[in-house]
Curated annotation (Swiss-Prot):
The gene is rpsK. This is Small ribosomal subunit protein uS11. The lineage of its organism: Bacteria, Pseudomonadati, Pseudomonadota, Alphaproteobacteria, Rickettsiales. It comes from Wolbachia pipientis subsp. Culex pipiens (strain wPip). Located on the platform of the 30S subunit, it bridges several disparate RNA helices of the 16S rRNA. Forms part of the Shine-Dalgarno cleft in the 70S ribosome. Belongs to the universal ribosomal protein uS11 family. Part of the 30S ribosomal subunit. Interacts with proteins S7 and S18. Binds to IF-3.
Amino acid sequence: MKKVKTVGKNTKRFITGIVHIRATFNNTFVNVTDVCGNTLYQTSVGACGFSGSRKSTPYAAGKVADSAAKKVIERFGMKVVSVIIRGPGFGAEAAVKALRNCGLTVTSIADKTAIPHNGCRLRKKRRV
């Protein structure tokens, strides 16, 4: 008698989740977690095929958020997310728009960019 193999993994279904968007001046990172903070999927603009100065564009950030949303919907059946944005980059708003256009319901958007209260000394100014 042949053994029957199961195809695919038994994955848990997560209806709600948190999308962490780290938008720097040179890159954008998207990390999707469950409500406990366990990472379900993570990607960046460089992993989606962009390189050089094209990584810092809002279009690239939208594309990476779009691919992350499609993967999470397909794998885990996620429908509702809350978004946490960190960093001063240009791609944060484009990434949130891409999440909405992909079919995810965005319940809240929080900007948790770290702002120093005159803590550490800044880097030296660039001279051009």
